[in-house]
Structures are given as structure tokens and as C-alpha cells.
Amino acid sequence: MLGGEECEPHSQPWQVALFERGRFNCGASLISAHWVLSAAHCQTRFLRVRLGEHNLRKRDGPEQLRTVARIIPHPRYEARSHRHDVMLLRLTRPARLSRQVRPVALPTRCPQPGEACVVSGWGLVSDDKPGTKGSPKSQVSLPDTLHCANISVIPATSCNEDYPGRVMASMVCAGVEGGGADSCEGDSGGPLVCGGVLQGIVSWGDVPCDTTTKPGVYTKVCSYLEWIKETMKRN
């Protein structure tokens, strides 16, 4: 997470950490007691789910560990184009809902340009001093604590200028004018929440993220409501 700061602990109670054989792999979002939503590119064979996390290295109290009963990436996911980068995970046993572990609402409408959002994750953060961003002095590292950044929805027209021909209608871009706040490597699969509603899933962007002024690109959740609801019903 670039240009963000440590989140108020448990202020994003739907935030999920996905682990692969004990290593942090991706973010995700709790959307019901049984279901977690993430990006298809986060799929690995031995996914474990951690809920109620803030500091990944410390036991805090509200953490819950879950195994995954079913991993369901979108059937038409394409790694090269990032198309349909969405995946559902069914938990083996339901989350115990609490103040620190709570599902996020799915959207009833699509995000509007300029809408204010929060992106959260345990992805790379920059250690640089102000003014060194993009210089060889710029350093990135993985934080222990969940980070949050305030960004807004970028109009499709300007996002298309940054990524000609690569942004589909089922994607949404978000960032800040001129760059400086963005999701980064390791934030993948995590939530973009606008007005308390899950509007995006961290999908892709310009690499390396600490030297770019281009916005991040997110899977647009409103495009997948049918698929999400159908899949949850059938499984």
C-alpha cells in the first residue's frame, strides 16, 4: 500500500489474509459467514484463511483461522489480460461474526467516478522519505500491520489513457491525482470499499507500483453480482 498508513486496528473487519503453506499470499474480503471473495490470480493449492487480523506477526485476540472447502475461480478468468479476475472461497466452517470479523456489503450499483474509497492490505509499503519517491533511494518492504489508503474512483476515459486497450468494462480504476497512493504487490485480492460497500478487488496495475503515477486497476464487483450470487447458491 503506497501513500497509505496503518489502518485503525480492526476498522476493516471484512479484511481477510490468505496464506499459502504458512506464507502470506493475498488479501480477500469476507462477504458472508461462509464465503470469501478474492482475485482469481491469488489461487494456490493450499489456501488458508485468517480473519480478524491486524498484525500478522502478533496474536491479538480476535483472529480466526479457517481452512477452505472450495476454491472457485471465475470460469473465464484469463491471466494474461486479467479478465474476470475474481474468485470465491467457501470456508470449511463459518466465521464467528463479531465487531472485528464482519462481512462487507456487496454493491447494489456500480462505482461512480470521483467516489471516495479505501483500499487495504498487507502489501508493500514505501520506507522512503518524502521527495525520494521514484529515485534509487526509494525502498519498499512488507509491513506486519494492515495498511489503508484513501483513493478515489478514476473515470474510465482517463484510465484508458494510462493503459490503452487494457481496461475492460468489468474493471474499475482508483488512485489519487498525480499518483502517490496505490495498492501494491501483496495487496492483490483485497478490498476496495466505497461508502461501506465492496466495489473493487485489487487486481493489477503498473509495475513497480512505487514509481508509477498510474492508478491501480480493480475487478469491478458490480459486474459479477450474478456470478457471485449463483455460485454461492449452488455451493
Positions of the model-derived regions?
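Conserved H-D interstitial segment of serine endopeptidase catalytic domains
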Residues: 36-79, 135, 149, 156-158
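Extracellular trypsin-like serine protease catalytic domains
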Residues: 1, 15, 19-21, 115-235
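Conserved hydrophobic/aromatic beta-strand scaffold that supports enzyme active sites
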Residues: 15, 35-37, 63, 86-88, ...
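Conserved beta-strand elements of beta-rich interaction domains across eukaryotes
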Residues: 23, 35-36, 42-43, 54-56, ...
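Protease-domain processing segments flanking chymotrypsin-fold serine proteases, especially trypsin-like
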Residues: 1-37, 48-53, 59, 139
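Serine endopeptidase catalytic core focused on the charge-relay Asp
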Residues: 79-101, 110-122
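Extracytoplasmic
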Residues: 11-13, 44-46, 63-68, 84-86, ...
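Extracellular/periplasmic catalytic domains that process cell-envelope and extracellular macromolecules
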Residues: 7-11, 30, 80-82, 109-114, ...
